Every structure is written in C-alpha cells, then in structure tokens.
C-alpha cells in the first residue's frame, strides 16, 4: 500500500464501502480503522485487523463508528445518506460518494488524498490495469449481466457501462434506456437477449451461482 509523505499521520478514517476502503488502504493504510463486512474485504490480508462497522445490506452501526473516534467517514450517496447525516450532526466530517464513471473516481481519489494529507496519486498508478490497451480493440458485441433474476445489464449511465465504453467494448445495451428501477441498468427478457445475439455474454459473479441460474433460464 502507498503511504506517501503524510502531513497528518493521525487521520482516523472509516470507509463504509469496499471501494473507499480499498482507496484509503492504497493511499495511507494506517489511516483506515473501520470497514464494511464484505467478503471482498474479509478475504484480503491487509484488512484483517480493521474493525467491521456494517454487515450486508444493513445500515452501519453508528455506535461502533463513534467509538472509533473517526476524523472522516466515507459512504455511498443514497444508501449511507442517513448515517452520514447523523455523523455530521455529531461533528464528524463525512464524504458522500457517487461513482458513475472514471472521472468521478479520479475526483474521489484527489479528494481523499487532500483530506489525508498525502501526495495525490493518479488512477493509473493505483490501478495499473486501468491503462488502455494500444491498437484496435476487437469489436465483438457484448452483453454484461449483473443479475439473473431479473436479467439486469448495464447501459452507459452506470459505473459498469462507463467502464465498458472507456475500454471500447461494444456493449449492445449501452444506449438502451433504463426502465428497471435500477438507475443505469436495463431489465432484459430472454427473448431480447436472443434477439441481440451477442458474440460474448459476461456474467458477473455475485456469489449466487450466477452461471447455473442463468443457464436454467
């Protein structure tokens, strides 16, 4: 993890999302005190000593957060809005995040860096795999599925869809408007999937045996 030249080594940070926990860990791991109880973080060695302040889709424990005496709490706009507001009322600084594209992520990295007092790092230096490949990317048509019931696929207005566009992947759902109730995601019927007939179908593993659920349809 990058620790950088810190102006304030005593900054105490709690991250309520996997993304913000990962970013703080990469920028200055010593600042990160609390994390969400996601399997993504629990499986990584660098987070084993961090305090878990939330589980699953349940709201974070305000009492546990306060007991850690944080200087800063990072959460997701919408899902954590109520908790962040309560913490603000108690005089704790908060940052509400909404990441829809790579530019939003760059801005968040810059904001966290300034708050921690560390040298700002580019997205590419933190995540080298974000570098675009040189040469012409094959234009095979693709549909990404993030859920099997219902079949949900990201358009260009979602974080996943913006990444597909950024790396010139031919997302057949990119310009279809969302009517699913999930902003940035389109509900597909099996008939539409067959009609689109993509060269590639990418299944996002959410831990629910996505492949078998999809094939059962």
Predicted regions and their residues:
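Short helix-initiation/N-cap motifs at beta->coil->alpha
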Residues: 53-63, 177-191
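A short, structured surface patch at a secondary-structure boundary
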Residues: 11-68, 72-77, 169-172
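His/Asp/Glu-enriched short active-site or ligand-binding loop at hydrolase and phosphoryl-transfer sites
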Residues: 36, 160-184
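Short secondary-structure boundary segments
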Residues: 17, 77, 146-149, 200, ...
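Extracytoplasmic ligand-binding site segments that recognize negatively charged/polar headgroups
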Residues: 82, 98-113, 143-163
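Proline-aspartate-enriched helix->loop->beta-strand connector
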Residues: 61-75, 92, 187-206
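Charged, glycine-enriched surface loops/patches
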Residues: 83-120, 206-217
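Bacterial Sec-exported substrate-binding components of ABC uptake systems
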Residues: 1-23, 60-63, 85, 115-145, ...
């Amino acid at each position: 993890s990058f620790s950088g030249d810190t102006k304030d080594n005593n900054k105490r940070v709690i991250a309520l999302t996997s993304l913000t926990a990962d970013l703080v860990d990469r920028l200055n791991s010593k600042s990160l005190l609390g994390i969400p109880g996601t399997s993504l973080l629990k499986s990584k060695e660098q987070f084993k000593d961090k305090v878990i302040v939330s589980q699953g889709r349940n709201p974070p424990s305000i009492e546990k957060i306060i007991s850690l005496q944080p200087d800063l709490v990072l959460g997701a706009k919408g899902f954590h809005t109520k908790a962040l507001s309560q913490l603000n009322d108690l005089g704790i600084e908060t940052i509400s995040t909404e990441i829809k594209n790579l530019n939003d992520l760059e801005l968040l990295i810059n904001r966290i860096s300034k708050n921690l007092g560390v040298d700002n790092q580019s997205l590419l230096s933190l995540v080298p795999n974000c570098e675009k490949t040189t040469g012409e990317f094959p234009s095979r048509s693709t549909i990404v599925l993030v859920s099997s019931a219902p079949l949900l696929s990201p358009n260009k207005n979602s974080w996943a869809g913006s990444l597909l566009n950024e790396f010139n992947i031919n997302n057949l759902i990119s310009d279809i408007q969302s009517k699913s109730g999930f902003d940035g995601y389109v509900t597909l019927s099996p008939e539409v999937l067959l009609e689109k007939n993509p060269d590639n179908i990418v299944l996002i593993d959410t831990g629910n045996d996505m492949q078998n659920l999809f094939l059962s349809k």
